[in-house]
């Protein structure tokens, strides 16, 4: 699990804004983006070049084929860079479309919080209020002599708070080290025919632990996608388009590109576990890589979206602005603050600080579909308190830092890691070492 971040998108006084009306007149939104002098927003240009040099080095080392990065502070674009190629030949473009996988999760979280504001659900509602199929959930306790799982009934149904924070106990199937995850993989949960089919499969697989007693990355955000459909009466993609993508002018974000934008979809690579080299991707979590140019039958809120650097930057800027961008109000400020507030119980955090390799502690927790930094210095980071972040399976990442009023979006397309230093860690470090006048 990795920490990622976000921040702000716009233009200098003499330029255009990423969010402004003039963008619509450009061929793509990326074409209208202008950058400002780093010093005008507190950065040192020479120190910031270390970030550019590092990313260029990642390409030179053939760790990824191509990359884009976007750094924004005070709504002004400090740096918007491309590196490498789209497909091993064509240069990477600023309007390239990427499979963002789990960076879909914060978007689904926003969709859920829109419905929360409408009174459609409450944090302590049992999920069975909306999904009766989960009434007979069980918890795995071990494996019997016959090789089958031994289970006990849940002491209570998971709550919506737990569904929003990976503390409900569900498995996932991204990895198959644990028995529950192996069941997810064997039953093809991620490859279900549609969301109702997925819910039926999940209902028959035991939880990893009693709800609220642990944290485990899970299918919960795909369950949220199903909940969005039930609570809104719309398909997930239609709801996101009408309530998020349309208002935010995220013109290239959705569950597929369509034939007209297929040429802008960056090629997907994976790590060959025998050589640790980068090769074209053929497999994804036990199945074939989907065709992202065609509308899927199952719209995955947990990992199905494609997007561009600029589009996701607009989403990040909305969060940084506490729910609003260019006059489009998506959420109330207090709701964004709620999303960015840790909801993992203290007793669970104390256990996780060791079990999750130090990823969680009283300094770093998890809110509504985002990782949150409560105390950056205590966490050993030079970023800001209140940071929200996440990333995706193919290496995409972002963070939003309200303390320093900035965000960062990074896009790559390599499954299985980037074969070296963690891009999220290095991009954060090199960004903040260059922010020498945070008061500006």
Predicted segments, located by residue:
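Bacterial N-terminal signal peptides
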Residues: 8-19
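Short, conserved catalytic-motif segment at the N-terminal edge
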Residues: 33-100, 120-122, 136-145, 421, ...
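Signal peptide processing junction and immediate N-terminal pro/mature segment
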Residues: 18-29
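Short, surface-exposed loop or secondary-structure junction motifs
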Residues: 132, 137-383
């Amino acid at each position: 699990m990795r920490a990622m971040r976000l921040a702000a998108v716009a233009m200098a006084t003499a330029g255009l804004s990423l969010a402004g009306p003039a963008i619509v007149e450009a061929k793509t939104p990326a074409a209208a983006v202008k950058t400002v002098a780093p010093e005008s927003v507190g950065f040192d240009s020479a120190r910031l070049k270390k970030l550019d040099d590092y990313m260029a080095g990642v390409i030179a080392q053939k760790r990824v084929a191509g990359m884009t990065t976007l750094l924004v502070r005070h709504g002004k674009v400090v740096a918007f860079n491309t590196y490498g190629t789209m497909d091993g030949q064509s240069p990477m473009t600023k309007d390239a479309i990427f499979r963002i996988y789990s960076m879909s999760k914060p978007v689904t979280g926003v969709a859920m919080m829109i419905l929360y504001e409408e009174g459609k659900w409450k944090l302590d509602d049992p999920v069975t209020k909306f999904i009766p199929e989960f009434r007979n959930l069980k918890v795995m306790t071990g494996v019997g002599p016959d090789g089958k799982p031994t289970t006990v009934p849940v002491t209570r149904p998971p709550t919506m708070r737990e569904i929003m924070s990976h503390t409900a106990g569900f498995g996932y199937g991204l990895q198959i080290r644990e028995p529950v995850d192996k069941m997810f993989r064997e039953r093809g949960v991620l490859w279900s025919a549609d969301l109702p089919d997925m819910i039926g499969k999940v209902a028959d697989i035991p939880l990893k632990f009693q709800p609220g007693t642990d944290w485990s990355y899970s299918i919960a955000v795909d369950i949220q996608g199903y909940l969005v459909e039930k609570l809104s009466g719309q398909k997930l993609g239609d709801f996101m388009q009408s309530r998020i993508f349309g208002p935010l002018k995220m013109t290239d974000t959705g569950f597929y590109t369509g034939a007209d934008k297929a040429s802008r979809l960056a090629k997907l690579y994976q790590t060959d576990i025998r050589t640790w080299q980068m090769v074209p991707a053929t497999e994804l979590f036990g199945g074939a890589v989907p065709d992202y140019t065609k509308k899927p039958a199952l719209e995955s809120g947990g990992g199905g979206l494609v997007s561009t650097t600029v589009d996701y930057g607009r989403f990040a800027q909305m969060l940084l602005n506490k729910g609003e961008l260019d006059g489009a109000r998506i959420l109330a400020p207090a709701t964004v603050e709620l999303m960015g507030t840790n909801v993992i119980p203290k007793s669970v955090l104390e256990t996780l600080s060791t079990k999750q390799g130090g990823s969680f502690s009283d300094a770093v927790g998890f809110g509504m579909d985002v990782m949150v930094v409560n105390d950056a210095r205590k966490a050993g980071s030079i970023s800001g308190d209140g940071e929200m972040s996440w990333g995706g399976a193919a290496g995409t990442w972002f963070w939003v830092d309200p303390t320093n009023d900035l965000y960062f979006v990074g896009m790559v397309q390599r499954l299985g890691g980037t074969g070296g230093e963690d891009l999220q860690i290095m991009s954060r470090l090199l960004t903040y070492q260059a922010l020498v006048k945070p008061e500006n």
